[in-house]
């Protein structure tokens, strides 16, 4: 019987059990590999970041900026597996990409399968421009200032290391800037990427220790992080230069 995503709709800190996280990792793999042909490495790179962003819970939304679900698709903060965020970030001035796209296509924003589909649209201007006419508001953005690779190359790359896969996903899909702030535990993303990759291949790895995101997990605390703290205005914009 096909697996189905487990979700809990709730604000920051709404976590899943380890068994449910593992189930969702397999669901992500089934979608991105089985339906869209992504490489195992590319999916693992994304999953490493998903743990730190959402704890693999497609129903989580960020509450630290005062957002509620009463005015969707407008929401100031991150939502879903990849924590799609409104732009300018946290302002609530424009729709959040995830509920905007889901409502346009007739899906619930917390639908994990739909979120996997939306990831495949990271360079499709029909989705990334959101009909606003001001250019991409989210998506895969490359730059000479940080590690970059074309999206189509990334999703089919089966020779890159898990660290490289996490690096490309973090910079090109999520962060869009060349410095990593102190509060980002990049090494946790690499560990969870390897964990997901091992699950894909039938192993039973021990869960890495918890990072700063909502996902639970036994083990030691976060390792030291890399990079410098960004000025506040850059944290809010997160755009390439």
Please identify what each model-predicted range represents.
Residues 150-208:
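Active-site or metal-binding loop neighborhoods of secreted/extracellular toxin and effector enzymes
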Residues 2-12, 19-22, 197-217:
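GSAT-biased (Gly/Ser/Ala/Thr-rich) low-complexity helical/flexible tracts used as stalks/linkers
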Residues 26-30, 34, 44-47, 117, ...:
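Solvent-exposed, polar/charged alpha-helical surfaces in well-ordered, non-transmembrane soluble domains
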